[in-house]
């Protein structure tokens, strides 16, 4: 076995004993004074003469160099000097006649230790093994520790780390952006026999927009000195170059799938569970790939009609329902089940029309889940409904029904669903929904984040602290600050949403135009769903304010076009009116802390927000929709950050250099193709060794970026506040319908043990600038194996880092006979979960 092998050789067993702890005490070293050659080679202590060729050393680049024992003496001597002089500069570092600045006794120790190292190296060389530089350094470190000079050994370890840092590889493109694009968003092209490449995906999306606005492409956009067609061309080029991103749902579904179902354009939505139709509509939205926020506050759920008393199942008239093989069919099955408890019938479902598991979904892409996920969900929902007859539904029951519906989507639908449940702060059942051993009896509750509503003008600090302490202890429930209990948010809480309206004459006319069939009077309040429409600016590209403003205009242009897709007949006319009257945008910035000199400048942020608002107003006029009420936000950007090669949203890079790990099933075609080009970047995932591997990508933060270690929790929250004040608030164009409602800066705060109290005080005192805050206790990234993010710190980390040289993958050569895309793997609006892929 060669010295460079990683197996448990005698050399590595001995070298493992030299690992330094913080106080420089070696672990499991032989007794002080032991001649270490007797540990390594007990059969011989004598140096055996070998030829010069045999004693050549393997350098780091693989070349051979002459064996020079005096370099060993010098390296050990410099470590002694550093330990004795607390790291001071050594004026004699190159002067052997001055013993490298050491005393006679220390120099004698140096020669003795060097002799043992030389003997050991030459013994290995005599056996035909050519040692590497790192292996010789391991021996030096071990011999110093074995001689009892622990302070010198630590100095030598630090010296090695410093030299390794100077030699660390500079990786260019790591491959993560293209891998994520191909594995998570690329559509299968049957005509090409492969998945589309990123430029082809961008073209597909913008051809959809050109088709929709075909009659307007030559129209000059007021104030822009360009036609709409030219602005679309500019936007496509920016997306192709990854300077900006559209809605990632549009990248996933753009084309026929969105034209058939406009809900697929939108990342997320929010609604009140105040009408029996909301259950089936929520399922339809989840099946469309939309993240769903919902309110089960008491004032909303109480609007559901009470359930009549119910006879036993065998005494009820049976109603048969054959479930159509569409997302509308699945949602209708939910509606039939809930309504059967109002109508006094027992519904039996026929699943025979649902395609078999694995069948190709030609419009939306991916593969059919089969009928089992829906069947299981409906039976469990029936169990919840069986307990209700004779009274009104409780919020916890409405919540569980929706979570069981979400589990059907997660098990086999288009994508993993993302949900947030907002509830009344005094609802003890919802407060305690995830306490005790809830996962044993109510595992469906894992599919949501839960937050209590705190109206800013009414909430007390005691209420807030009760929730804050629950987050610290259990992780949930969270808190949600609002101006009005009828407002809400998407699952990541960066979009302010108001899914109800007060009817006026204009609204009533619109409702009639869109076919609203119910009687409604001026002054009535009715509810539906409000959607959020997101785009992203690549912060790393914003080297100057001017470039930032340019990308603001691009992102606002894309978002405004996306806001025109409002036909969702399954949700009804109320939802369409709600969405069209405010035509929301969510222009986000990904990688704010990559360019803090630009993107934390209040004046630059304000001008950028104004650019977004003005561009939206101009493009909206050109395409005939309302200008947006709210335009700017900051979303978590978990997956987008990987596509763009930036830190996520407003969050800092994990470190200057770190490993970013992405899980991949061994059956995934894209993963296997990537591995064939870059096997050195893949390894078995220890938690799922039978089925899953991980890819380790090397990530390096740009010069000038703010890193995780550079800021504490309060400094980070202050940055969130600054961006909210100067980017989000100026991006609020009007408050005509929903006073005080704002978009937000989605953020996750890492809190050290001594920071919790000050963080609570800061959030409470500045609650006008915060809506929801995710709180995570600080922990080390080496606390468990194969962490999603791991800083490069140790010499072995550097060796691994230097070995992660990426060979660019030509995905155009990846051939697939059929569509094996797995769009359910893509998560939108999933908060912290975005970091774990």
Question: Where are the predicted features?
Answer:
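Extended catalytic cores of very large enzyme megasubunits
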Residues: 2-837
């Amino acid at each position: 076995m060669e010295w460079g092998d990683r197996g448990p050789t005698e050399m590595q067993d001995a070298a493992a004993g030299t690992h330094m702890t913080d106080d420089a005490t070696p672990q499991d070293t032989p007794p002080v004074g032991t001649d270490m050659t007797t540990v390594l080679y007990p059969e011989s202590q004598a140096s055996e003469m070998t030829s010069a060729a045999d004693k050549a050393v393997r350098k780091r680049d693989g070349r051979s160099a002459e064996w020079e024992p005096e370099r060993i003496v010098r390296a050990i001597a410099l470590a002694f000097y550093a330990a004795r002089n607390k790291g001071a500069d050594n004026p004699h570092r190159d002067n052997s006649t001055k013993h490298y600045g050491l005393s006679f006794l220390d120099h004698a120790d140096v020669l003795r230790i060097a002799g043992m190292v030389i003997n050991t190296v030459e013994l290995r060389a005599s056996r035909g093994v050519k040692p590497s530089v790192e292996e010789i350094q391991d021996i030096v470190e071990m011999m110093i520790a074995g001689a009892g000079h622990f302070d010198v050994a630590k100095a030598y370890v630090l010296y090695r780390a410093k030299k390794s840092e100077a030699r660390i590889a500079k990786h260019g493109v790591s491959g993560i952006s293209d891998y994520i694009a191909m594995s998570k968003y690329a559509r299968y092209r049957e005509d090409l026999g492969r998945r589309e490449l990123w430029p082809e995906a961008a073209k597909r999306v913008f051809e959809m927009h050109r088709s929709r606005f075909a009659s307007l492409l030559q129209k000059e956009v007021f104030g822009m000195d360009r036609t709409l067609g030219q602005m679309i061309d500019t936007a496509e080029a920016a997306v192709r170059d990854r300077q900006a991103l559209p809605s990632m749902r549009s990248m996933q579904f753009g084309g026929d799938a969105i034209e058939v179902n406009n809900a697929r354009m939108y990342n997320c939505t929010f609604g009140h569970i105040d009408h029996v139709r909301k259950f089936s509509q929520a399922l339809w939205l989840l099946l469309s790939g939309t993240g769903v926020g919902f309110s089960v506050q008491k004032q909303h759920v109480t609007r559901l009609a009470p359930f009549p008393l119910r006879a036993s199942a065998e005494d009820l008239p049976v109603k048969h329902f054959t479930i159509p093989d569409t997302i509308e069919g699945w949602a209708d099955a939910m509606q039939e089940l809930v309504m059967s408890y109002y109508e006094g019938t027992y519904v039996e479902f026929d699943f025979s029309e649902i395609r078999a598991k694995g069948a190709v979904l030609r419009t939306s892409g991916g593969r059919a889940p089969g009928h089992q996920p829906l069947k299981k969900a409906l039976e469990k929902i029936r169990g919840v409904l069986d307990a209700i007859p004779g009274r009104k539904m409780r919020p916890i029951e409405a919540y569980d029904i929706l979570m069981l519906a979400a589990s059907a989507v997660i098990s086999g639908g288009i994508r993993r669903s993302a949900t947030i449940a907002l509830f009344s702060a005094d609802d003890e059942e919802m407060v305690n929904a995830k306490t005790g051993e809830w996962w044993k009896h109510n595992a469906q509750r894992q599919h949501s984040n839960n937050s209590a509503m705190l109206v800013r003008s009414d909430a007390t600090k005691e209420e807030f602290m009760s929730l804050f302490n629950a987050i610290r202890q259990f992780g949930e429930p969270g808190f949600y600050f609002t101006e009005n209990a009828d407002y809400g948010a998407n699952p990541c809480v960066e979009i302010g949403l108001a899914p109800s309206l007060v009817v006026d004459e204009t609204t009533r006319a619109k409702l009639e135009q869109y076919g609203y069939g119910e009687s409604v009077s001026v002054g009535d309040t009715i509810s539906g769903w409000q959607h959020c429409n997101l785009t992203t600016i690549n912060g790393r590209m914003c080297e100057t304010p001017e470039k930032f403003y340019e990308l603001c205009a691009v992102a606002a242009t894309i978002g405004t076009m996306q806001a025109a897709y409002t036909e969702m007949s399954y949700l009804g006319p109320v939802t369409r009116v709600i969405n069209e009257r405010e035509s929301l945008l969510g222009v986000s910035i990904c990688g704010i802390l990559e360019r803090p000199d630009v993107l934390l400048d209040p004046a630059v942020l304000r001008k950028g927000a104004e650019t977004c608002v003005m561009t939206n107003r101009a493009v909206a006029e050109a395409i005939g929709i309302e200008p947006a009420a709210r335009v700017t936000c900051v979303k978590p950007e978990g997956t987008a950050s990987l596509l763009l090669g930036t830190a996520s949203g407003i969050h800092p890079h994990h470190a200057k250099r770190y490993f970013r790990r992405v899980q991949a099933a061994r059956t995934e075609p894209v993963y296997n193709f990537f591995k064939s080009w870059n096997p050195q970047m893949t390894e078995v995932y220890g938690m799922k060794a039978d089925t899953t591997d991980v890819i380790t990508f090397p990530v390096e933060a740009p010069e000038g970026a703010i890193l995780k270690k550079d800021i504490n929790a309060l400094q980070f929250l202050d940055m969130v506040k600054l961006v909210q004040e100067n980017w989000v608030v100026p991006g609020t164009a009007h408050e005509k319908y929903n006073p005080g409602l704002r978009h937000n800066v989605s953020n996750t705060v890492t809190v050290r043990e001594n920071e919790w109290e000050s963080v609570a005080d800061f959030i409470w005192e500045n609650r006008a600038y915060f809506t929801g805050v995710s709180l995570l206790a600080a922990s080390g990234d080496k606390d468990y194996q194969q962490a999603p993010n791991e800083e490069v710190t140790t010499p072995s980390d550097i060796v691994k880092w230097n070995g992660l040289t990426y060979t660019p993958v030509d995905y155009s050569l990846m051939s697939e006979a059929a569509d094996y895309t797995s769009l359910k793997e893509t998560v939108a609006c999933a908060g912290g979960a975005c970091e774990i892929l």
